[in-house]
């Protein structure tokens, strides 16, 4: 009897019975062979001209040795040229010795395309697989991009470059098209924070009332009041700019100066000032309530709409504190203190962005701008190059004429207006060369602006459809299911705990009964 020990594996009775290593997911097997393939004997464990039987995800095929020999660098080519069964097992997932069949737990659809590659030498792209899954399958089987057919190579490379940011395509990737799972997961994580918080259930309901207009009837009423206050604030700012109010404030300021008082506190109309105070009080209440009810303070300050709320009310309180600290003398010394109030009034216009909570179009526009920074950068680059070139040409052609083209920086305004096809007409060329330059500037602007705008418009359409689909899913969802989700976050009920205990006891009993010796099942081939 001959006994060998190779890499920790015991081989006994070399010419009669061989105990082979345990395959992946199976039992240790025994087989009878004529000779053992030693590393120095040069004897192969299977014939070199023997066909290779493979099973890929349930698809069984038989490949000829001649076809595999044409591509020795591929996985199946290396499997065909394997010098030992141990080496072959490293290249597959499992091996059926009775059928002499190699099993691969891979995509069966790609395997059919792989068979076509071994017949023709060209690999074609599968539309059923995304580019990344297709690339992973190709790398696993030992195929590179050079194996792609000429008809599919350009399309594959283009899709691979544009797939991570393909916001204008109707793909099925969760990150770009179907945000519902991600957004629902975010909501669940936020709601889970209330489980261990004090008065968590009450805070959670109030937070949902303020953040979700469709949550309940009080949330709809709160949303209507918030929109009304925002519109009233914007209307007050617009009314304040009317000439009659400006004249009234100017007269009040002159009277205050004549009386020896600071004119800063009497410039506002009393009605508009009261309306402004009411809006500020509501905005302050809204911001403070959201901050107190927010499940995460860090996430609250990272939300763009919350930052807009804070920036809108903060200048008012800073101006109020400065006025109280400086008094009348400070107001006279720092005459520009009123400009801070003007800045506050200007920043109030950003309150209109709060309407994005209730507008699908505004949310789609924000998402489009967020994911179109590359296109916007390209657009600005094109405009900068075009304005610089045509401004220099217009300056050269019109510098002798007194029409406003005195310097190249002065021509930048004309170039920007012309390239964007606005055409105010305040500065126009008068010479033939200047008019030709203006014609080129206008035509170039049409071409330059149109190219990125098309991509941005496609992205906006994509995000708009996605937001509409999400809103439809939220409207059609059962309110009782959402209540069940909220109840599940509070904790497991006593009935659920009792059921889990009974299930655990039954499982332990089943485990005790299953400890009896039995014949291990044979692995099944799919």
Curated annotation (Swiss-Prot):
Subcellular location as annotated: Cell membrane
**Which SUPFAM superfamilies does the entry mention?**
POZ domain, Voltage-gated potassium channels
Q: Which residues lie on this side of the membrane: Cytoplasmic?
A: 1-217, 294-304, 359-373, 465-526
> Where does the UniProt annotation place the signal sequence?
none
Q: Which residues lie within the membrane without crossing it?
A: 409-420, 421-428
Q: Chief location of this protein?
A: membrane
Topological region Extracellular: 240-270, 323-337, 396-408, 429-435
Motif Selectivity filter in this chain: 421-426
TM segment ranges: 218-239, 271-293, 305-322, 338-358, 374-395, 436-464
Q: Where are the compositionally biased (Polar residues) regions?
A: 505-517
Regarding tissue, the record states: Detected in all tissues tested with the exception of skeletal muscle. Highly expressed in adult and fetal brain, fetal kidney and lung, and adult prostate and testis.
One annotated Gene Ontology cellular component of this protein: plasma membrane
A GO biological process held by the record:
protein homooligomerization
Q: Coiled coil: which residue ranges?
A: none
| Lipoprotein recorded as keyword | no
Renumbered to this chain, region (Disordered) spans 493-526
Q: Which InterPro entries match?
A: BTB/POZ_dom, Ion_trans_dom, K_chnl_volt-dep_Kv, K_chnl_volt-dep_Kv5/Kv9, SKP1/BTB/POZ_sf, T1-type_BTB, VG_K_chnl, Volt_channel_dom_sf
MF terms from GO for this chain are: potassium channel regulator activity; voltage-gated potassium channel activity
Which keywords, in A-to-Z order, does the entry hold? Cell membrane, Ion channel, Ion transport, Membrane, Potassium, Potassium channel, Potassium transport, Transmembrane, Transmembrane helix, Transport, Voltage-gated channel
Protein's membrane topology: Multi-pass membrane protein
Assembly information from the UniProt record: Heterotetramer with KCNB1. Heterotetramer with KCNB2. Does not form homomultimers.
Primary role: Potassium channel regulatory subunit that modulate the delayed rectifier voltage-gated potassium channel activity of KCNB1 and KCNB2 by altering their kinetics, expression levels, and shifting the half-inactivation potential to more polarized values. While it does not form functional channels on its own, it can form functional heterotetrameric channels with KCNB1 and KCNB2. Each regulatory subunit has unique regulatory properties that can lead to extensive inhibition, significant changes in kinetics, and/or substantial shifts in the voltage dependencies of the inactivation process.
Could you give the domain comment from the record? The transmembrane segment S4 functions as a voltage-sensor and is characterized by a series of positively charged amino acids at every third position. Channel opening and closing is effected by a conformation change that affects the position and orientation of the voltage-sensor paddle formed by S3 and S4 within the membrane. A transmembrane electric field that is positive inside would push the positively charged S4 segment outwards, thereby opening the pore, while a field that is negative inside would pull the S4 segment inwards and close the pore.
Q: Of which family is this protein a member? A: Belongs to the potassium channel family. S (TC 1.A.1.2) subfamily. Kv9.1/KCNS1 sub-subfamily.
Recorded protein name is Delayed-rectifier potassium channel regulatory subunit KCNS1
